[in-house]
UniProtKB/Swiss-Prot annotation:
Belongs to the universal ribosomal protein uL4 family. GO terms for cellular component: ribonucleoprotein complex; ribosome. SUPFAM superfamilies: Ribosomal protein L4 (SSF52166). GO terms for molecular function: rRNA binding; structural constituent of ribosome. Residues 46-66 have a biased composition (Basic residues). It comes from Chlorobium phaeobacteroides (strain DSM 266 / SMG 266 / 2430). This is Large ribosomal subunit protein uL4. Residues 45-85 are annotated as: Disordered. Pfam families: Ribosomal_L4. Residues 69-80 have a biased composition (Polar residues).
Length: 208
């Protein structure tokens, strides 16, 4: 698949890039993408939820009233799960939600996600650009020139550029990342992917 390279004004530069078929032209595996995205979202969970059992609730050591003769049901503690203010039965405890996915599956998932975007025509390539200062306006104008200002965009750069990253972080629809750090979730969670030209080489080195 070939794509025309655009400039920051949204016009064609006359240059054409060829997408690597091993990355952008594979058969899409929805199951691999599902496994990878599920693990990514699960691994983000802190797992610090905690409810106290009857043994952990403060107090309740003394028997609230005598065993017999009151007419009430027998109770040994005011911290019983049956009492108001008591412990919780089978409540949430701290745990790890981490899920392991094999490297080959993660690789297939990212290739599948990129291939799905390529087949849908949701990949654009722009020439490499730099900004002189941290300003949101130039980045917003680039998106407007490309007709992407109303879409959820993933911009991939060849390397971390602090000025570009900070200039774009105030735009809600824009997510800027380096090509070698992108995940399946990042790809699928965007309406379109905007590659800087040399970022294509970077991602081919990573996923090739």
């Amino acid at each position: 698949m070939e794509l025309k390279v655009l400039n920051t004004s949204g016009t064609e530069t006359g240059e054409v890039v060829t997408l690597n078929e091993e990355i952008f032209g594979v058969e899409v595996s929805e199951h691999a993408m599902y496994l990878d995205v599920k693990s990514i979202l699960a691994n983000k969970r802190q797992g610090t939820h905690k409810a106290k059992t009857r043994a952990q609730v403060r107090g309740g050591g003394r028997k609230p009233y005598r065993q017999k003769g009151t007419g009430n049901a027998r109770q040994g503690s005011t911290r019983s799960p049956l009492m108001i203010g008591g412990g919780t039965i089978f409540g949430p405890q701290p745990r790890s939600y981490d899920q392991k996915v094999n490297k080959k599956v993660k690789l297939l998932a990212r290739r599948s996600a990129l291939s799905a975007k390529a087949k849908a025509g949701k990949i654009l390539v722009i020439e490499d650009f730099r900004l002189d200062a941290i300003k949101t306006k130039p980045v917003a104008e680039i998106l407007k020139n490309l007709g992407l200002e109303q879409k959820k965009i993933l911009m991939l750069t060849p390397e971390y550029d602090m000025i570009i990253a900070r200039s774009g972080r105030n735009i809600p629809v824009l997510n800027i990342m380096t090509a070698d750090k992108v995940s399946t979730y990042d790809i699928l969670n965007s309406s379109a992917i905007l590659f800087q030209k040399t970022a294509l080489t970077k991602i081919e080195d990573t996923l090739g």
